[in-house]
Amino acid sequence: LCFTITLFAQDVTFKVWEGEIPNSKKAINYKEKAEIENGRMRSISQVSQPTIAAFLATENVSNTAIVICPGGGYTHLAMEKEGYKVAEWLNTLGIHAFVLKYRMPSPETMQQTAIGPLQDAQKAMRLVRAKASELNIKLDRVGVLGFSAGGHLASTLSTHYDREVYQVESKYSARPDFSILIYPVVSMQEGVTHQGSKNALLGKDASEELIQQYSNATQIDA
């Protein structure tokens, strides 16, 4: 495993990927741009190094964990409003929370932009499940929560959890046991989608096949 955390520690950050990140390209001038306020990251753009911030509950601890995907139109991440604050609130309910700083889809840093965020989300779910025993989390009580474009990523994970988008070595499933989608983007179809999110993830000239594949409201099979 690529991280070690202490039970009940709060706001421990670890890498999603150790070594080479799949589907990545070197881009010397592509740097993360963070907006910091009162010592905390309010938002960040141009993410190319995905991380997870672990917020572990200390009181009335349940057996539940949630991976949080902040929104931002696939161009930036609202880390404070749709990440850290939500994680802290979940902690008051006894729920462990893991805020995912996922990669922004960019042809500068990715070979295939459409699968980049999904790769990070799948890996994050597997990493949390790998730590389930240590953190007293039930393997069947690991969910995902997402806002806006992060809601699209959460719904993509929920409907494409078994799609092989990187070489999987973990024995753990990436399937969320439950999904909480808050004002999510659930379609990439014209007239319905959030155009900025669609353009950022799929490109302005996306094929109809790709649009349909990432219109997750139509991908539900049960």
Where are these regions (language model features)?
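N-terminal cap/lid segment of alpha/beta-hydrolase-fold proteins
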Residues: 10-64, 118, 193
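Bacterial Sec-dependent N-terminal signal peptides
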Residues: 1-12
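Short beta-strand element of the alpha/beta-hydrolase
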Residues: 63-71
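A fold-wide structural signal in alpha/beta-hydrolase
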Residues: 65, 91-98, 143, 178
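Primarily recognizes the serine-hydrolase "nucleophile elbow" in alpha/beta-hydrolase
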Residues: 123-197, 211-212
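Catalytic nucleophile-loop/oxyanion-hole region of alpha/beta-hydrolase
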Residues: 78-79, 84-86, 102-139
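Short amphipathic alpha-helix adjacent to the substrate-entry channel of hydrolases
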Residues: 56, 79-100
